[in-house]
Amino acid sequence: MIKLIVGLGNPGAEYEATRHNAGFWLVDQLARMGGATMRVEGRFHGLAARARLWDQDIWLLKPSTFMNRSGLAVVSLARFYKVLPDEIVVAHDEMDLPAGAAKLKRGGGAGGHNGLKDISAHLSTQDYWRLRLGVGHPRNAPGGAGAGREDVVNFVLKPPRREEQEAIDAAIDRCIEPLGLLARGDAERAMAQLHTTR
């Protein structure tokens, strides 16, 4: 069962269209589907809404703390509504997957993602679900960009190219049905369906 879906990103118009905000894009799509309006919730350090999705009430959250402090928002809402870590899905950008790919997994390390690191620290566990939305990697980008720290930061804080954006949007659409399966407690089918469709 899933009770909370968190999308990671950075607040502000200047970041809205950047690769790092792929998690926000997924949550926005779910809010539209569930007829929910994301509202500023100071006690949860972000925008939150309760949406009716897959015949269940599910909290949606977009932290407004900036990526590296996302854990504060997640733990605030989770504690208030008594949501357990394994009832949380965190959707985030993933450079180790090409644009248009999506993978679902439970637990594991942060893979260098500072938002995940902070969430794990605040929850005192890594045992929550992650929906990894591929955005590609600078070493594979046209123009021969490198893979140093500065290249990575510049890459995730820029908008994807048009064809990449279309691929990411399509991946988000493909995630909806598997998320519904996961929300209803069928994790095995959710992962099988997401990982075999493209």
UniProtKB/Swiss-Prot annotation:
TRNA binds at residues 15, 66, 68, 114. Hydrolyzes ribosome-free peptidyl-tRNAs (with 1 or more amino acids incorporated), which drop off the ribosome during protein synthesis, or as a result of ribosome stalling. InterPro entries: Pept_tRNA_hydro, Pept_tRNA_hydro_CS, Pept_tRNA_hydro_sf. Keywords: Cytoplasm, Hydrolase, RNA-binding, tRNA-binding. GO terms for biological process: protein quality control for misfolded or incompletely synthesized proteins; rescue of stalled ribosome. HAMAP family: Pept_tRNA_hydro_bact. The active site is at residue 20. Its EC number is 3.1.1.29. GO terms for molecular function: peptidyl-tRNA hydrolase activity; tRNA binding. It catalyses: an N-acyl-L-alpha-aminoacyl-tRNA + H2O = an N-acyl-L-amino acid + a tRNA + H(+). Gene3D superfamilies: Peptidyl-tRNA hydrolase (3.40.50.1470). The record marks 10 as: Discriminates between blocked and unblocked aminoacyl-tRNA. The record marks 93 as: Stabilizes the basic form of H active site to accept a proton. It comes from the Bacteria. Pfam families: Pept_tRNA_hydro. Belongs to the PTH family. GO terms for cellular component: cytoplasm. This is Peptidyl-tRNA hydrolase. Monomer. It is found in: Cytoplasm. It is an enzyme of class 3 (hydrolase).
